[in-house]
Amino acid sequence: MTTDAFKEYVKTCRALDTEEIHRFMDDMSNEARRITFRLNTAYHTQDEVRGLLSELFGYEVPESLRVFPPFYADFGKNITVGEGVFINACCHFQDHGGVIIGDGCQIGHN
């Protein structure tokens, strides 16, 4: 299964109940944990943070994105961020179904 195929399947609101989907979700969650571990276990400049988040999200994030780690996502590839977004430390995102953060949003820590 591809990331795009998974995103399209999720949009149909059908159950995520096949072996193929479970394997894909496990693989993607493992990848997200590897990337967020690198992000969260050392100091990074904002350019480095954006680079790691681009890897996690699967596209180049806006240069105006600011994130204070630690940052957590269980999937990563279904998060969309707009321009001028700020995400404070310790935010957790469960994004298998999709998370869209619009322009200018500021998200506080939990």
What are these regions (language model features)?
Residues 1-64:
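Terminal amphipathic alpha-helical/low-complexity segments used for targeting or macromolecular assembly
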Residues 59, 63-73, 79-91, 99, ...:
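A structural motif detector for beta-strand N-caps
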